[in-house]
């Protein structure tokens, strides 16, 4: 099962790899209690190429942690496992959950996002590529 959300530009309220508001935490707990996934160790946060702006979030139930993944403890009952390939793009992101008369959705407030598409489903981040390094020549 995947959980989708909308991306918002802006600054999160906390400085962390990834954080969740109380409303997001409450909703994630409800979903996890409803699904009862065997051997679930938390939620895996990742990104994939999709949408007008290039990237969107993936949030799935995790049954194992990969070697370079980062574990963030959102609550004593919830671990967020950040996929190593997504780490630079999501550092500082805060996940929120809103309920309005016409929609209920998760929102990701990502300080690294430089652009979002019109519907907010996808985003672009700063370029984190490492420039070519010029090493000194050995004599």
Swiss-Prot record:
State the similarity comment: Belongs to the HesB/IscA family.
* SUPFAM superfamilies associated with the record: HesB-like domain
Q: Please tell me where Fe cation binds in this chain.
A: 52, 117, 119
**Which GO CC annotations does the UniProt entry carry?**
cytoplasm; mitochondrion
The record's keywords, sorted A to Z, are: Iron, Iron-sulfur, Metal-binding, Mitochondrion, Transit peptide
Gene3D superfamilies in the record, alphabetically?
A: HesB-like domain
Q: Give this protein's Gene Ontology molecular function annotations.
A: 2 iron, 2 sulfur cluster binding; metal ion binding
Provide one Gene Ontology biological process annotation: iron-sulfur cluster assembly
Stored InterPro entries:
Fe-S_cluster_asmbl/transfer, FeS_biogenesis, FeS_cluster_insertion, FeS_cluster_insertion_CS, HesB-like_dom_sf
Q: What does this protein do?
A: Involved in the assembly of mitochondrial iron-sulfur proteins. Probably involved in the binding of an intermediate of Fe/S cluster assembly.
* Cellular localisation: Mitochondrion
Specify the species.
Dictyostelium discoideum
At the top level, the lineage of the source is Eukaryota
What's the protein called, per UniProt? Iron-sulfur cluster assembly 1 homolog, mitochondrial
């Amino acid at each position: 099962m995947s959980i989708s959300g909308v991306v918002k530009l802006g600054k999160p309220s906390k400085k962390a790899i990834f954080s969740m508001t109380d409303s997001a935490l409450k909703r994630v707990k409800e979903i996890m209690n409803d699904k009862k996934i065997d051997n679930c160790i938390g939620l895996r946060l990742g990104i994939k190429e999709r949408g007008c702006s290039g990237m969107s979030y993936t949030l799935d139930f995790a049954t194992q942690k990969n070697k370079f993944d980062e574990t963030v403890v959102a609550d004593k009952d919830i671990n967020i496992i950040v996929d190593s390939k997504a780490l630079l793009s999501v550092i500082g992101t805060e996940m929120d959950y809103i309920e309005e008369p016409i929609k209920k959705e998760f929102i990701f407030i990502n300080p690294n996002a430089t652009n979002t598409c019109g519907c907010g489903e996808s985003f672009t981040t700063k370029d984190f590529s490492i420039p070519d390094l010029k090493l000194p020549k050995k004599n």
